[in-house]
Amino acid sequence: MDSTAFVGAAAPLRVAAAARSTICMAAADDKPVVSRRAALTGAAAAALAAVAGSLPALAETEYANVPFLGGSVIIDINNANVRAYAKYPGMYPTVAGLIATNGPFETVSDLYKIPGLTDLQIATLKKYEDKLVALTPTPEYELDKVNNGLYR
């Protein structure tokens, strides 16, 4: 009877007859081991899955207006966090909080329609009006406008 045994790399290997099943028995402990065919099939399937899985996801990876969230001189009043206004004296925290909680705004001039603004707050808004822009509100940044979870 023809048998197949996997002993080591240098050991002679006898090929099993074609009618035999793909599971072989190890000579040492008679436990089933995976045949070469099954191992190669599994490796080919894994390689195919790796290639198929490397196709690009068609998702937006970065918000195009990230610089206006506080990383530049101009701040987006519809998406920026209140901390972004700290670079302009008089804006943080009160005026910034009013902007974050009363938006969205169509234009920067809509800021003057916020109810309850004091004369000093209006003067502060006028002072930094050229540093503000009203971009399209993005839902991903709505929760982060007041508290983005970043602390010193």
Curated annotation (Swiss-Prot):
GO terms for cellular component: chloroplast thylakoid membrane; extrinsic component of membrane; photosystem II. Coiled coil: none annotated. It comes from the Eukaryota. SUPFAM superfamilies: PsbU/PolX domain-like (SSF81585). The keyword Cytoplasm does not apply. Keywords: Chloroplast, Membrane, Plastid, Thylakoid, Transit peptide. GO terms for biological process: photosynthesis; photosystem II stabilization. Its main location: plastid. It is found in: Plastid, Chloroplast thylakoid membrane. Predicted to be translocated into the thylakoid lumen by the Tat system. It is a peripheral membrane protein. Residues 1-35, 36-59 form a transit peptide. PSII is composed of 1 copy each of membrane proteins PsbA, PsbB, PsbC, PsbD, PsbE, PsbF, PsbH, PsbI, PsbJ, PsbK, PsbL, PsbM, PsbT, PsbX, PsbY, PsbZ, Psb30/Ycf12, at least 3 peripheral proteins of the oxygen-evolving complex and a large number of cofactors. It forms dimeric complexes. The oxygen-evolving complex in red algae is composed of PsbO (OEC33), PsbQ', cytochrome c-550 and PsbU. One of the extrinsic, lumenal subunits of photosystem II (PSII). PSII is a light-driven water plastoquinone oxidoreductase, using light energy to abstract electrons from H(2)O, generating a proton gradient subsequently used for ATP formation. The extrinsic proteins stabilize the structure of photosystem II oxygen-evolving complex (OEC), the ion environment of oxygen evolution and protect the OEC against heat-induced inactivation. Belongs to the PsbU family. This is Photosystem II extrinsic protein U, chloroplastic. It comes from Pyropia yezoensis (Susabi-nori).
